[in-house]
């Protein structure tokens, strides 16, 4: 579960504004998109296909989650499909490594990027660098301590508040 670091006061029913859920299965996505407090979903390609076919993009912000490991180029027709989904209402991409960011930049889609915790944003200099690249937002690194977070510019950041985090990604 991702939540924005700063935002408006609690929404209706005391919900947290800006709550985003990263789902690995369609079952998880179906459960999450039905919740009012959830603003958006991060979905892998095969789940995004199903979500877009069901029109979930008309109810929630959807972001295509890149895999943790990327090769030199995206699979055939990946960006053709992603561009179509953007036209149909998908909001952007969850980027987990520099290779994926490079692929987005090559396609002119870097301004649709949300950086995951695996992308370097440990300090204000790194945050400033990525903001100059035009990304939508970043995610606070998992390893940061509270004191380090207090000294970091978190205005355009998400913070993971709950989840299963594998030891090695």
Residue ranges and their predicted role:
Residues 1-169:
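Non-catalytic helical/linker scaffolds that mediate oligomerization, partner binding
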């Amino acid at each position: 579960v991702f939540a924005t670091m700063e935002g408006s006061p609690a929404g209706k029913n005391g919900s947290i504004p800006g709550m985003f859920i990263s789902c690995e299965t369609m079952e998880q996505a179906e459960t999450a998109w039905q919740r009012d407090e959830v603003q958006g979903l991060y979905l892998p390609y095969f789940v995004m296909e199903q979500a877009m076919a069901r029109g979930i993009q008309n109810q929630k912000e959807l972001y295509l989650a890149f895999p943790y490991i990327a090769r030199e180029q995206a699979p055939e027709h990946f960006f053709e499909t992603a561009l179509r989904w953007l036209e149909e209402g998908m909001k952007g991409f969850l980027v987990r490594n520099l290779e994926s960011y490079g692929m987005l930049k090559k396609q002119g889609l870097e301004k649709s990027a949300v950086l995951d915790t695996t992308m370097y944003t440990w300090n204000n200099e790194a945050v400033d660098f990525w903001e100059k690249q035009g990304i939508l937002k970043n995610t606070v690194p998992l390893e940061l301590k509270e004191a380090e977070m207090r000294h970091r510019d978190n205005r355009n950041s998400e913070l993971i508040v709950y989840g299963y985090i594998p030891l090695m990604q």
